[in-house]
Each structure stands twice: as structure tokens, then as C-alpha cells.
């Protein structure tokens, strides 16, 4: 489809008028499961290509659609959403996604078409790089009852989305913008209650990090509780170490949880962690932050466990740990 030469904007307007003037304007219903709908009778391959070019040919559709009357805009909304495959082709295109988002602001009647199409293809829309922004726009501007139905779907598929390359980005955007207290708390609870699963996932860990950045004390405490006993294991891993470092930045209870995990592990394991590619950053950050925050017994217990093995840490990048340990005076 994209290999066909793009038609000019004036040609597109002429084509729209030609299609609409063949007979009195009527808003076609979505296609039925059996037989042929009005949409299929009127729609030709050329019509589909013209509309595709119109929707994807410009980054700014605002001026182009400002000259269209209500009837034509309603017809466009139906045309774009009546066929699922065609709707996805438009939404997956960068400019097409932006154009649809602009059309979604035009009227509540038009938004009904877009809402139905998004809900019909919810997962496909949410895990696409550009299509997901169409759904997010819907959650901003649709009426409350429609937004709540979309939120219900988000809660149902939250863990699936969190572990998808683009789904995790969309989910983070929704968490950031969600202003309904009930749905926000429910979504945050899903993330925090599944913190261990998500922290071990290449994409899910970004969602846990995002929630920790929001500094919600209830969710942060819940995440720390779910990860208690697993901080050493996570610190060895690239993505898991990011979560542990985020918990350290929160301080207080999460930091104490991490120190207790490190103290509970065998000395051999702790030294391996301090020498590992990812774990050394966790140990170093822990030593830098805990001196003025933790109780003396916890802090010096960790220092005393590491200091006898400083000679094993004399290599890059662990040399920073050695310098920190060497600068500390540990009380007898």
C-alpha cells in the first residue's frame, strides 16, 4: 500500500467529494459478520488508498480537516474504523496515529466509532509503538463511561502489557496520567504485588522502576516486601540491579531490606556480588548512601563483612568500593 505514489491533498478532497456525491450522504454502519455491508459496496481499493494517503501523508492534519463539514467527518470516522485490518494499518503508521488522535477530538459522535474500534482490537493497539498512542488519547478525551471500560481492560491485561516491548511504554504512560483514584490504586497494586515477576523481566522492570519513581509510600513498601529475600539475586542481573538501585534511592525501609538481604547471604556470595558487573554498582551505592541513614549496627555490620576481603576487590570497577571501605573508621 505504501509503495503507491501519494496523491496530492487537492486530489484527496476531490476524491472524497466524488465518493460522497455519488448518492445522498449516509453514515455507513460497521460491516456485519455475514453478507455485504454498505461500507463494502461503496469502498473500492482506490478509495482505501486515497484515505490512507490522506491520513498518513502529513504530520499536521489540523488545517486539512478544518475545511470538512460534520457529515464528511462522520463518514471518515466510519470509513476508518469499519474494517479492523484497515484501522490497524492506519494506527500503526506514525502520521496515521497522529491524524487519528486529531480526529478523535472533533465530536462525541465520532468518538463512538473510534472507541468501538479500539476496544475490538485492544491488545493489538496497546502493544504497537504508534497505535498505542491512539488508545491513550482515547483515555484522555472519551466520556467517563468509555474511559472506565478501557481502564477495566488495562487492569485485566496489565501484566501482559508490562512484559511487552511497547506495551510497557504504554502502561507507564497510563500510570502517569491516570487520574481516577480507584483505577490508579488498582493498577499500582497489580504492579507492586507482582514486583518479583516484573523485576526479572526485560520490559517489566521498567514498569516497576516507573512506579518507584512516583514515590507512593504504600506501593514502594509493598514492592520492598515482595522483593525481600531476592535483592542479592536481583543485583546480579542487569535489569534486577536497576530495581535494587531504585529502592536504595527511596531509602528508609527499602534500604534496610536490602542491607538485611546482603547480611543474610554467605560471605562468598557477597564478595561475588561486589566483584560482579552489575552487583558492584549496588554495593557501591549502598555504602555511599547508608552511612547517614541506617542505624549504626546495620551499616557497620555490612562494612565489617566486606572489609576483610578488600584485597579481592582491587580491580576496576570495584576499586571505588575499596576506597569507600578504606576511608571509614569502624568502631570496635
UniProtKB/Swiss-Prot annotation:
Stretch forming the signal peptide: none
Cellular component, GO, one term: cytoplasm
Biological processes, Gene Ontology terms: post-transcriptional regulation of gene expression; regulation of translation
Ranges for the Pumilio repeats: 82-117, 118-152, 153-188, 189-225, 226-264, 265-300
Recorded superkingdom: Eukaryota
Cited SMART domains: Pumilio (SM00025)
Residue intervals of the PUM-HD domain: 1-302
InterPro entries, sorted: ARM-like (IPR011989), ARM-type_fold (IPR016024), PUM-HD (IPR033133), Pumilio_RNA-bd_rpt (IPR001313)
Subcellular location(s) per record: Cytoplasm
Coiled-coil parts of chain: none
Molecular function GO terms recorded: mRNA binding
Keywords, comma-separated and alphabetical: Cytoplasm, Repeat, RNA-binding, Translation regulation
Location, primary (coarse class): cytoplasm
Function comment: Sequence-specific RNA-binding protein that regulates translation and mRNA stability by binding the 3'-UTR of target mRNAs.
PANTHER family found in the cross-reference section: PUMILIO HOMOLOG 16-RELATED, RNA BINDING PROTEIN PUMILIO-RELATED
UniProt remark on domains: The pumilio repeats mediate the association with RNA by packing together to form a right-handed superhelix that approximates a half donut. The number as well as the specific sequence of the repeats determine the specificity for target mRNAs.
Name this protein carries in UniProt: Putative pumilio homolog 17
Higher taxonomy: Eukaryota, Viridiplantae, Streptophyta, Embryophyta, Tracheophyta
Gene: APUM17
